[in-house]
Swiss-Prot record:
Signal peptide: none
Pfam family, one: MarC
Protein family according to the UniProt entry: Belongs to the UPF0056 (MarC) family.
Entry's localization field: Cell membrane
Keyword Acetylation (UniProt): no
Keyword Nucleotide-binding: no
Major place of residence: membrane
GO cellular component, one term: plasma membrane
Coiled-coil regions, chain positions: none
Protein name from the UniProt record: UPF0056 membrane protein MJ0972
Length: 228
């Protein structure tokens, strides 16, 4: 009886460690693709004409909107796949390539083109004109973050694991919101070279993640073709 209890305890420990590792993986992947550090110069340029209180409110609304977008994809992404007949392995390959492109831009300390268009204009009289576009979409919850969310959900098999993905989204958005709220402070304390160095490090990590995602997708597609 004691032996059974001991085995049961060890099984639970291993199970919860796997869940913790999945949460950390999800949080880190989302944090890197959101890239709040790299967004600091953009957010500063978009919001500096507004008073400080208004800037904080803009960032808060953008974070909430971005969180809702990612949660919608997390909860209903599989239905979208089913409707369009998209397999998860095909999405892994396509999404991995997109993440690799974003990571490549980050390695060169460039703003990913999927996140920003140089010809975007601002209407300073309307806060919502920058809260939803371009701040919430595509800067914060851009194609990279949406792709990462969908891939994380594809790895889940239980309600608990789906809850872990939701928690990863909320955590990554919370930390990103805190960082972006400190944009003025960080701009004053850290020069652009320090920000670029951090972006390059995050880009290197994202390259590794994207290559692994592409490889997993290719193996899955090959196996499905072999079975047929």
């Amino acid at each position: 009886m004691v032996g059974y209890s001991g085995e049961h305890f060890i099984f639970n420990v291993v199970k919860y460690m796997d869940i913790l590792n999945f949460y950390i993986y999800g949080f880190v992947s989302l944090f890197i693709t959101i890239d709040p550090i790299g967004l600091i110069p953009i957010v500063h340029s978009l919001t500096y004409p507004y008073p400080k209180e208004q800037r904080i409110r803009i960032i808060k609304k953008a974070i909430i909107s971005s969180t809702v977008v990612l949660l919608l994809f997390a909860l209903f992404g599989n239905y979208i796949f089913g409707y369009f007949g998209i397999t998860i392995d095909a999405f892994r390959v396509a999404g991995g390539i997109l993440l690799f492109k974003i990571a490549w831009d980050m390695l060169h300390a460039e703003i990913p083109k999927t996140k920003h268009k140089p010809d975007e204009r601002l209407d300073l009289e309307d806060i919502d004109s920058i809260v939803y576009v371009p701040l919430a979409i595509p800067l914060i919850s851009g194609p990279g973050a949406i792709t990462t969310t969908m891939i994380l959900i594809s790895k889940t098999q239980s309600i608990l694991e789906k809850g872990v993905v939701v928690l990863s989204i909320l955590s990554a958005m919370l930390v990103s919101g805190i960082i972006l709220s400190l944009t003025d402070f960080i701009i004053r304390r850290v020069n652009i070279y320090g920000i670029n160095a951090f972006v390059r490090i995050m880009g290197l990590l994202l390259v590794a993640i994207s290559v692994q995602i592409i490889f997993t997708g290719i193996v899955g597609l090959y196996n499905s073709i072999s079975v047929q």
